[in-house]
Amino acid sequence: MAAGNSSWARAAFTFKATVFKKSRYVIYYSLLEHRFSLSLWGILKYSGIYFCTEILRSFPKKRCKSHPYRVDGYPAGSCLDPPLHEPLDTSTPKKISLVSCSNSYMRNKTDNGKVGSRNVSEYKLEGDFASTSKSIYYKLNNLEKMNRKLAWIEAVSSEFSFWEKLRSKQIFPFQNEKDLIAEPFNYELAVSHRRPVIYESISLVPRSVTRTLSRFKAELTNQSNLNLSVHNKFDLAKNQASVSLQYVGFLLFLFPIQIAIENWFLEPRIRGWWNIRQIQLFSNVFQEENALKQLREAEALFWLDDVIGNLADTQLQNFDTDARNETTRLAMMYDELNIQLLLRLATNAISIATLFPLLIFGRKRLAVLNSWIQELFYSLNDTMKAFSILLLTDLCVGFHSPHGWEILVQSLFEYFGLTPNKYVTPCFVSTFPVILDTLFKYWIFRHLNRTSPSIVATYHTMSE
């Protein structure tokens, strides 16, 4: 059982670790891709603005024909040359605020009209530099935010890895607390440091049964001195076991309630109604045939007794009286059978009407119960699992199972007061076990081959 739990927990941990690594890789890749795209976009934009400026500065003087009066005020170098009293360094972009632009504009406005046209194109270029600088500054701030996000993701992933390793230690319950603290992040090393399993003595009771009972007792009593993660696991198992037992106890508690309602509430009313408004004595033809057969057998016995006991008296005076008493007894017997039949039908209808809403509204508890039963089944060793499967299949679809199905079908017919049909029972016995056997084989092929192939091998070996 310990090896099975260890392999199952190891597989679950490996799957969770793989999913977490893939998710972390996607997050890292997306953030780094976004960061690289922002950096590349800023570099390209800055380079494009710079080269465009250099191209405009290299244009000849004849481009300024629309403003011929500017030649008098500036040399014939370029129409975009800055004034001598305010040099502009285009080698590095600087942050230029709106206030500085407005001050420069107002200061240059007092000059002659020849300078006005120059200021328009110049401050247009300076506005481009300002917008570029602000954009780059904003992107740099975004890069800092991205770096902080990456650091936060690394911290969270480290913490998550630490807690995952703590949970993984529950796979190896024989590892002490010192090893747990010394190796919080090394799963493979923890595997290598496991202690050997203590030898268990052989007894008449299978060890898997004793281990299952011990585990069940530990889940209920919480007698565990393991670390925090193992303690949480036992708390979860304890809650699962308690919820399952409470749900089963609640369903079993319905049977005493059903018996109480049947005896104290339904039976007096049904009995009074049947005795007052009785239409016929027999509810079906099958009861009538059985009553007639029993009456004939009783009359034959009475006649034989009278003949043997009264050899001298040939009139047989007591025969009619005994036959009449037997008829009255049979009538009372079948009358009681009909009352019990109506009582069972009413009780079953109330039980079904109560049970279905409980199952529908208690789907979560039913799922917990299902998982708990599966866990108890899979906690057994492979031999016990194969033995349980063989026992169930032989009882339901084995060589002698048709006789049991016939008895079950006839009992159901009698329970509900129906007439047995000579065609329904053979048809059911010949088809239903075959369908059930097919479902068993499909379950073994589809489910057990994936979860535990060793169970399938043991099952085939035991069945052969």
UniProtKB/Swiss-Prot annotation:
Keyword tRNA processing: no
UniProt keyword list: Antiport, Chloroplast, Hydrogen ion transport, Ion transport, Membrane, Plastid, Plastid inner membrane, Potassium, Potassium transport, Transmembrane, Transmembrane helix, Transport
Record carries keyword Membrane: yes
Membrane topology: Multi-pass membrane protein
Membrane-spanning intervals of the chain: 36-56, 241-261, 341-361, 389-409, 425-445
Alphabetical GO biological process terms: potassium ion transport
Catalysis: reaction(s): K(+)(in) + H(+)(out) = K(+)(out) + H(+)(in)
The organism's place on the tree of life at top rank: Eukaryota
Pfam hit, one: CemA
Principal location listed in the UniProt entry: plastid
Localisation per UniProt entry: Plastid, Chloroplast inner membrane
InterPro entries: CemA
GO MF term list: antiporter activity; proton transmembrane transporter activity
GO cellular component: chloroplast inner membrane
Family indicated by similarity: Belongs to the CemA family.
Function, in words: Contributes to K(+)/H(+) antiport activity by supporting proton efflux to control proton extrusion and homeostasis in chloroplasts in a light-dependent manner to modulate photosynthesis. Prevents excessive induction of non-photochemical quenching (NPQ) under continuous-light conditions. Indirectly promotes efficient inorganic carbon uptake into chloroplasts.
The protein's name: Potassium/proton antiporter CemA
